[in-house]
C-alpha cells in the first residue's frame, strides 16, 4: 500500500522471496496493477506523501494528513502524530527520491517486473481483465492458486508464501478444470536471472498419482493445454 504514515513499503517488511511471490500475484491479477514508484526494483527509499501547496493550504494538508491517522491505536497520542513526516517539508520530498542505480543492484526483482508486465501485454489470457474468467482458491494456509482462462487457453498461477508443498492434483477440487491436461511451466520466481535459487516448481507423475511440487516461497505460472 502507498501513503502509510512513514512511507514503508511491502518489501521493507518481508524477505525478497516472498516479495517476488506477492508481486507475481499482483501482476497476474485481472485488473490494472497500481505500482508505486520504485516498487518494481525494490527501492530502499520510502514512498512518502509529499505536497507543494501554498502556505495556508499546505498547513491544512499537513494537519489533515496527521489527523487522518488519529483513529489508529499507534497514533492515539497527538504527540506521536507529530512524528508523521510533514507533506510540505522539502525533506519529505527528498527522502522519497529514487536512487535509479538500485535497478542494477536489485536486477532480479526488476527483471521479474519487466517479464510479468510483458506477459500481461502479450499473453492471450493475461491481456484480458475479466474477473468472470478467473478463479482464485486458497490451496493451503499459505498458498494461493489462480486459474485464469480465455477461450480454450488456460493459465494457472500457484503462489506459495509458506513452506514447500506437494499437492495431489486429482484430489484437489480447485484444480478439477486443469488436472487432466498437459501443464507447461512458463514462469518461475526461482529463475536465477530473477533472483531465484534455481529450485523450480514441477509436476510429477501422471493420472491420479499426479502431484505438483511448489518449493517454499516460490510462485510459478503454467500454460495448460486446452
Predicted segments, located by residue:
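Loop/helix patches that line or flank the sugar-binding groove of alpha-linked glycan CAZymes
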Residues: 1-202, 214-215
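C-terminal beta-strand-rich structural cap/linker in extracellular carbohydrate-active enzymes
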Residues: 199-226
Amino acid at each position: 500500500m502507498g501513503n502509510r504514515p512513514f512511507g514503508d513499503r511491502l518489501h521493507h517488511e518481508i524477505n525478497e522471496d516472498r516479495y517476488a511471490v506477492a508481486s507475481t500475484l499482483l501482476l497476474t491479477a485481472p485488473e490494472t496493477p497500481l505500482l508505486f514508484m520504485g516498487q518494481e526494483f525494490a527501492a530502499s527509499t520510502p514512498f512518502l506523501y509529499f505536497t507543494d501547496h501554498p502556505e495556508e493550504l499546505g498547513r491544512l494538508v499537513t494537519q489533515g494528513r496527521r489527523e487522518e491517522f488519529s483513529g489508529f491505536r499507534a497514533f492515539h497520542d497527538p504527540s506521536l502524530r507529530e512524528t508523521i513526516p510533514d507533506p510540505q517539508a522539502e525533506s519529505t520530498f527528498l527522502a522519497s527520491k529514487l536512487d535509479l542505480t538500485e535497478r542494477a543492484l536489485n536486477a532480479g526483482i526488476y527483471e521479474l517486473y519487466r517479464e510479468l508486465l510483458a506477459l500481461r501485454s502479450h499473453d492471450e489470457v493475461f491481456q484480458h481483465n475479466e474477473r468472470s474468467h478467473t478463479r482464485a482458491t486458497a490451496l493451503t494456509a499459505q498458498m494461493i492458486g489462480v486459474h485464469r482462462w480465455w477461450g480454450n487457453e488456460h493459465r494457472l498461477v500457484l503462489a506459495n508464501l509458506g513452506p514447500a508443498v506437494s499437492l495431489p492434483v486429482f484430489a484437489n477440487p480447485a484444480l478439477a478444470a486443469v488436472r487432466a491436461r498437459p501443464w507447461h511451466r512458463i514462469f518461475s520466481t526461482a529463475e536465477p536471472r530473477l533472483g531465484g535459487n534455481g529450485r523450480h516448481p514441477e509436476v510429477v507423475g501422471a493420472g491420479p498419482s499426479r502431484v505438483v511440487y511448489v518449493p517454499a516461497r516460490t510462485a510459478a505460472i503454467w500454460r495448460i493445454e486446452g
